[in-house]
Amino acid sequence: MPEHATLPYVLERLTDAEALARAQALAGRLKQRRTCRDFSPAPVPRAVIQAAIAAAGSAPSGANHQPWHFAVIGSPDRKRAIRAAAEAEERRFYGTDGDDPKAGAEWLAALRELGTDADKPFLEIAPWLIVVFAQRKGGIAEDGQTQNYYVNESVGIACGMLLATLHEAGLATLTHTPSPMGFLREICGRPEWEKPVMIIVAGHPAPDATVPAHALRKKPLAQIASWL
């Protein structure tokens, strides 16, 4: 191993029983997470969102370059602009703009069980939109020149940690990926070497919020894991 600076790494040592209890408790809470499309406008403290993003920013990344940026939108005007641009793309996706849909018949059929359409009122109603950007270049210094590595993998892990932390904080979330979504770079004022990845909507669910029954169908552990 090449010579490099190091620091001690110490974790709390748990008994097997404690480790299992913690893992099962967290798994139980995360299994309650759902994608929410019915949000309340009730405010959420900025500090809660900041803490969740700080957790996401601790994710592992290629060469520790941390190739992500989280643009947090609370401004009603910017939320309105994002909704207008996103719904325009969604109308093209679903074919409700008068032209043939961009999405294939199989894709649209798969979405039918989730009840989605081109209307995205949650983009204005929820108190916070977190627009996640992947940085193709920049390194830790964000100089716009240094190459970043494993960008998609790194940003994906960070997004998962962000969603988990927001759920732990008692917030509902939704991931929205309009396609294309280049308009987000302009609205958020981000540089050209950053690529928008998704919008994470965060807030409290509306009192009458529902989720599709189909969303509760999860693959069993025996199907998603193999032991070799």
Predicted regions and their residues:
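Short alpha-helical scaffolding segments that buttress acidic/His motifs in well-ordered protein cores
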Residues: 30, 52-56, 200
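Glycine/small-residue-rich phosphate/adenosyl-binding loop
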Residues: 2, 72-155
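A glycine-rich helix N-cap at a beta->alpha junction
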Residues: 91-102, 189-212
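N-terminal accessory segments that position/regulate proteins before the catalytic core
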Residues: 1-36, 40-50, 92
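Glycine-rich phosphate/pyrophosphate-binding beta-alpha loops
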Residues: 57-64
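Short connector loops at helix/strand junctions that flank enzyme active sites
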Residues: 65-67, 123-127, 195
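Small-aliphatic-rich amphipathic alpha-helix that forms the alpha element of a beta-alpha
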Residues: 52-56, 130, 134-187
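C-terminal helix-cap and adjacent tail motif
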Residues: 2-18, 22, 198-228
